[in-house]
């Protein structure tokens, strides 16, 4: 780690507390507690994220060492000031990865001890969740038992290269050709326990042929296609219509083929997969019970299954609602481990069978928490209100009607409902827009009507009561209509593709200002030229809203924003819409003495990098631009300036940069 990429300093989040009155501290503590509730940090944060007494987000990468924490807002600003850190950037906490791994292993250890389970347990990390070197190496160097899973040839090569650090279990999923199969068998020859999971019947013939050529006894697994299926956004990866796995008939055929080839002893692993991000613990229990029946029946057929791979599905609570919604879970690590271990052990005990080694492929649960995308707001559009002025004499009827509604609202004795005022003003505004489109009103008329309508909405909003059920739909409608628009320096398609593709919710909140109660609502928009580049769902207390609660902020100097729990899938699924590339990335290590070490692991893609992806040679582009400039009658100094700017842009960041 070079000195240029290192920050080592104490960060004491409460350094200024002694300068404030105890009353102010108590008030800010109450506000911080309210903001914790508003954004549900206590539940999705997993004890890794918190709001400190300054109202800033703090990060504790290892909750077992509470004194090791860092103020994220202070860290980012220090790096911007001292190192010129560009935003957006991923702030990655490898210590969170290692703590997640330890926590899952510990949960299964407790479950095995609690239920007298005699088999072992292995967490196998499916690298498809996040293949970055920093992630894989942080996990394999953690000192914890860990296996690796590959789903393609490229992933298999990465896994084989890193497996030397663990000498552990390798699970090979996905569709396979002979090259993939040979790589797996070579891994077995090198001393690893490599399980080739049969996903389709045509693979078994190739496996046996290549094993004979390499003179190695293969370890085989079979993926059974269950009738059980989880619910949610990823339910299609499980169930009878799943893309992967063998039906009951095909499982029997596989056993017969292996028996005829005198290779039945090679079939050692049973695998199933209910789906990713399983929200309901009942779905997990049901799937484990059904798969345990496969284990029992295979033993009856003489198959000595030694490993029981329950696949992925261990979810994380993106919302913090602790519910069965698609982006939440109604269980924790301990309950998950208990259900898996008890379900398998109960079936084994009932039929007098040995307890197999349990494998889980819990990639999302390991990686999601460890990465935060931090970015800056580049523009704010917010509604400003001034005292409405009456329309000019002889104004069109639609304008007069809007003004009448406003005046009625100022009369204390008026008993018309808030809903009625809203509907009347909406109809009047619709009339204004229609008449404007037909040339009956001018632009000044339209602007006056729209501003008065906003004032009416603002007045109605002040009088609404969230505890009144009848008011809630109106509250939601007006919050969307009146929300500030924050234009954020990032690409939704590159950094949070699941938010765009499947409406997944990620926790988003300011990194500072959280010692003040929320006063405004906002929606976040990215900088792509695409109307889909907006975040549509936000955490709001124990629910989800279409706007984000915001503490008071200066629109000329808005706070930094953090997009949390983006460590699983988002980096690798991100696409290049508008040629926005990978963001910069840093690894952050936090120590009990208050020091923080930061290593720049990725500078982020340049414009030239992205152009080359689409076969646009940067040097040729520069040459073409130079030719255009030389053909002009601009003076030599100006030509040189334009060429310098173009070349600097080619090798600059794809995102917006301050001068």
From Swiss-Prot:
<dbReference type="Pfam" id="PF02784">
    <property type="entry name" value="Orn_Arg_deC_N"/>
</dbReference>
<dbReference type="InterPro" id="IPR002985">
    <property type="entry name" value="Arg_decrbxlase"/>
</dbReference>
<dbReference type="Pfam" id="PF17810">
    <property type="entry name" value="Arg_decarb_HB"/>
</dbReference>
<protein>
    <recommendedName>
        <fullName>Biosynthetic arginine decarboxylase</fullName>
        <ecNumber>4.1.1.19</ecNumber>
    </recommendedName>
</protein>
<comment type="function">
    <text>Catalyzes the biosynthesis of agmatine from arginine.</text>
</comment>
<dbReference type="GO" id="GO:0008792">
    <property type="term" value="F:arginine decarboxylase activity"/>
</dbReference>
<keyword id="KW-0661">Putrescine biosynthesis</keyword>
<feature type="modified residue" description="N6-(pyridoxal phosphate)lysine">
    <location>
        <position position="128"/>
    </location>
</feature>
<dbReference type="GO" id="GO:0046872">
    <property type="term" value="F:metal ion binding"/>
</dbReference>
<keyword id="KW-0620">Polyamine biosynthesis</keyword>
<dbReference type="InterPro" id="IPR029066">
    <property type="entry name" value="PLP-binding_barrel"/>
</dbReference>
<keyword id="KW-0479">Metal-binding</keyword>
<dbReference type="InterPro" id="IPR022653">
    <property type="entry name" value="De-COase2_pyr-phos_BS"/>
</dbReference>
<comment type="pathway">
    <text>Amine and polyamine biosynthesis; agmatine biosynthesis; agmatine from L-arginine: step 1/1.</text>
</comment>
<keyword id="KW-0210">Decarboxylase</keyword>
<keyword id="KW-0663">Pyridoxal phosphate</keyword>
<dbReference type="Pfam" id="PF17944">
    <property type="entry name" value="Arg_decarbox_C"/>
</dbReference>
<comment type="similarity">
    <text>Belongs to the Orn/Lys/Arg decarboxylase class-II family. SpeA subfamily.</text>
</comment>
<dbReference type="InterPro" id="IPR009006">
    <property type="entry name" value="Ala_racemase/Decarboxylase_C"/>
</dbReference>
<dbReference type="GO" id="GO:0008295">
    <property type="term" value="P:spermidine biosynthetic process"/>
</dbReference>
<dbReference type="GO" id="GO:0033388">
    <property type="term" value="P:putrescine biosynthetic process from arginine"/>
</dbReference>
<keyword id="KW-0456">Lyase</keyword>
<feature type="binding site">
    <location>
        <begin position="308"/>
        <end position="318"/>
    </location>
    <ligand>
        <name>substrate</name>
    </ligand>
</feature>
<dbReference type="GO" id="GO:0006527">
    <property type="term" value="P:arginine catabolic process"/>
</dbReference>
<dbReference type="InterPro" id="IPR022644">
    <property type="entry name" value="De-COase2_N"/>
</dbReference>
<dbReference type="InterPro" id="IPR041128">
    <property type="entry name" value="Arg_decarbox_C"/>
</dbReference>
<dbReference type="InterPro" id="IPR000183">
    <property type="entry name" value="Orn/DAP/Arg_de-COase"/>
</dbReference>
<keyword id="KW-0745">Spermidine biosynthesis</keyword>
<keyword id="KW-0460">Magnesium</keyword>
<dbReference type="InterPro" id="IPR022657">
    <property type="entry name" value="De-COase2_CS"/>
</dbReference>
<dbReference type="InterPro" id="IPR040634">
    <property type="entry name" value="Arg_decarb_HB"/>
</dbReference>
């Amino acid at each position: 780690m070079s000195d240029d990429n290192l920050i080592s300093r104490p960060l004491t989040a409460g350094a200024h507390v002694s300068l404030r009155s105890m009353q102010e501290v108590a008030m800010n503590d109450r506000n911080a507690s309210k903001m914790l509730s508003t954004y549900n940090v206590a539940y999705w944060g997993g004890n890794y994220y918190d709001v400190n007494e300054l109202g800033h987000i703090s990060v504790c990468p290892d909750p077992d060492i509470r004194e090791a924490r860092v103020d994220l807002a202070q860290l980012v600003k220090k790096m911007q000031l001292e190192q010129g850190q560009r935003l957006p950037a991923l702030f990655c906490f490898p210590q969170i990865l290692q703590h997640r791994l330890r926590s899952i292993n510990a949960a299964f250890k407790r479950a095995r001890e609690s239920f007298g389970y005699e088999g072992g347990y292995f967490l196998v990390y499916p690298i498809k969740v996040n293949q970055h070197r920093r992630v894989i190496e942080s996990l394999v160097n953690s000192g914890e038992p860990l296996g690796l899973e590959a789903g393609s040839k490229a992933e298999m090569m990465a896994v084989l290269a890193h497996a030397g650090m663990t000498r552990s279990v390798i699970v090979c999923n996905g569709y396979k050709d002979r090259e993939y199969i040979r790589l797996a068998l070579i891994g077995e020859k090198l001393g690893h326990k490599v399980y080739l999971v049969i996903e389709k019947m045509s693979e078994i013939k190739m496996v046996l042929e290549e094993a004979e050529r390499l003179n190695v006894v293969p370890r085989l697994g079979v993926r059974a296609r269950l009738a059980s299926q989880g619910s949610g956004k990823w339910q299609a990866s499980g169930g009878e219509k799943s893309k992967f796995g063998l039906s009951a008939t095909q499982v029997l055929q596989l056993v017969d083929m292996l028996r005829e080839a005198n290779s039945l002893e090679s079939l050692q692993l049973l695998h199933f997969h209910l789906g990713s991000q399983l929200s309901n613990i009942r779905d997990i229990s049901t799937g484990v019970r059904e798969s345990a029946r496969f284990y029992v029946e295979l033993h009856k057929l003489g198959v000595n299954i030694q490993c029981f791979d329950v696949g992925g599905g261990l979810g994380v609570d993106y919302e913090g609602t602790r519910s069965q919604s698609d982006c939440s879970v109604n269980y924790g690590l301990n309950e998950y481990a208990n259900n898996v271990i008890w379900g398998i052990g109960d079936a084994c005990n009932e039929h007098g069978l040995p307890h197999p080694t349990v494998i889980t492929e819990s990639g999302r649960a390991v990686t999601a928490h460890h990465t935060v995308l931090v970015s800056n707001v580049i523009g704010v559009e917010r509604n400003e209100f001034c005292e409405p002025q009456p329309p000019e004499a002889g104004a069109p009827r639609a304008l007069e009607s809007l003004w009448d509604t406003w005046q009625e609202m100022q009369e204390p004795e008026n008993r018309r409902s808030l809903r009625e005022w809203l509907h009347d003003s909406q109809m009047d505004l619709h009339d204004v827009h229609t008449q404007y489109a037909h040339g009956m009103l001018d632009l000044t008329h339209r602007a006056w009507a729209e501003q008065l309508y906003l004032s009416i909405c603002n007045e109605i909003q002040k009088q609404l009561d969230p505890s009144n059920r009848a008011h809630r739909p109106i509250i939601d409608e007006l919050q969307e209509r009146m929300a500030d628009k924050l234009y954020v320096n990032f690409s939704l398609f590159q950094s949070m593709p699941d938010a765009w593709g499947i409406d997944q919710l990620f926790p988003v909140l300011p990194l500072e200002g959280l010692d003040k109660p929320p006063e405004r609502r906002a929606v976040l928009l990215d900088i792509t030229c695409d109307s889909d580049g907006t975040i549509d769902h936000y955490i709001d207390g124990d629910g989800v809203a279409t706007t984000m609660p915001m503490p008071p902020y200066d629109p000329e100097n808005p706070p930094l924003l953090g997009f949390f729990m983006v460590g699983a899938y988002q980096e690798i699924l991100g696409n290049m819409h508008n040629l926005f590339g990978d963001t910069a990335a840093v690894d952050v290590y936090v120590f009990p003495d208050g020091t923080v070490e930061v290593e720049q692991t990725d500078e982020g893609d340049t414009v030239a990098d992205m152009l080359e992806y689409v076969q646009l040679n940067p040097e040729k582009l520069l040459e073409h631009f130079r030719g255009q400039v030389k053909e002009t009658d601009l003076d030599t100094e100006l030509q040189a300036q334009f060429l310098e700017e173009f070349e600097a842009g080619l090798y600059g960041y794809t995102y917006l940069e301050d001068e």
